[in-house]
């Protein structure tokens, strides 16, 4: 297990360095009420008093009220300012406009909300001189479980090297509210959605594999496939050069 006292100090120093080098006046991040947002919010607030978490409902059918409550509970405990921007009408308008141009797929529709949230965070960041903090962890990044140019877009990410297992350990060390530690991880993209059901592997299996542990051949095959088909999300943009 990591020394989370040391990890806390190093990551807070990292965030302060990012702000100092960029000349930013503050930080903004998406507060979904999940574990990653909770940890990022706590770290950012410790590094910068002017930290804002934004809750962005976007016609999500999953229990938004519970997620919003969990996000506020973390924010209240650690003194993080919370704002709400309802993107539901924006998404509905976008879908209506798209109907005239293409026949959408469930996956394409699911990725609209994360990209609208990214746009919202960068609008706030641009208007107020903030930097956008990313909330993706190492487990999600390895299998590409994030939306390209959506929740994967940010100016800095203080938890990108932590697996889901380590995120939970870190939150327990910080005495974060149990509500974000005990519920099943979910991107809340559709009714009943959970990360593990959608991926077909548990985070325990994924984290063990990333750490070099042994897992069943079928789970290894699934993880390898997810990593392979999502490689385009992790590499720089292909740019033409002579």
Annotate each PLM feature.
Residues 1-143:
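ATP-dependent adenylation/nucleotidyltransferase module used to activate substrates
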Residues 62, 170, 213-217:
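Residues at alpha-helix boundaries and short interhelical turns
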Residues 1-31, 35, 39-40, 152, ...:
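Peripheral terminal appendages
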Residues 76, 109-117, 131-202:
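Catalytic subdomain that performs nucleotidyl-dependent activation
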Residues 90-98, 112, 180, 209, ...:
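Generic structural signal of hydrophobic/aromatic residues within well-ordered alpha-helices
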């Amino acid at each position: 297990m990591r020394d989370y006292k040391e990890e806390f100090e190093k990551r807070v120093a990292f965030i302060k360095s990012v702000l100092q080098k960029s000349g930013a006046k503050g930080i903004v991040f998406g507060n979904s009420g999940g574990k990653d947002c909770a940890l990022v919010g706590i770290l950012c607030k410790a590094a910068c008093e002017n930290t804002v978490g934004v809750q962005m409902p976007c016609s999500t059918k999953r229990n938004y009220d519970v997620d919003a409550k969990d996000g506020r509970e973390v924010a209240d405990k650690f003194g993080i300012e919370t704002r709400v921007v309802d993107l539901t009408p924006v998404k509905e308008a976008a879908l209506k406009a798209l109907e005239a141009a293409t026949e959408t797929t469930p996956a394409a529709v699911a990725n609209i909300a994360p990209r609208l949230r990214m746009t919202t965070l960068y609008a706030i960041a641009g208007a107020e001189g903030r930097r956008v903090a990313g909330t993706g962890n190492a487990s999600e990044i390895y299998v590409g479980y994030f939306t390209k140019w959506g929740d994967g877009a940010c100016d800095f990410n203080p938890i990108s090297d932590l697996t889901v297992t380590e995120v939970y350990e870190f939150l327990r060390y910080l005495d974060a509210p149990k509500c974000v530690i005990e519920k099943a991880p979910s991107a809340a993209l559709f009714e009943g959605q959970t990360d593990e059901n959608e991926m077909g592997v548990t985070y325990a299996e994924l984290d063990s594999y990333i750490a070099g542990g042994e897992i069943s051949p079928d789970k290894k095959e699934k993880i390898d496939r997810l990593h392979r088909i999502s490689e385009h999300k992790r590499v720089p943009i292909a740019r033409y050069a002579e």
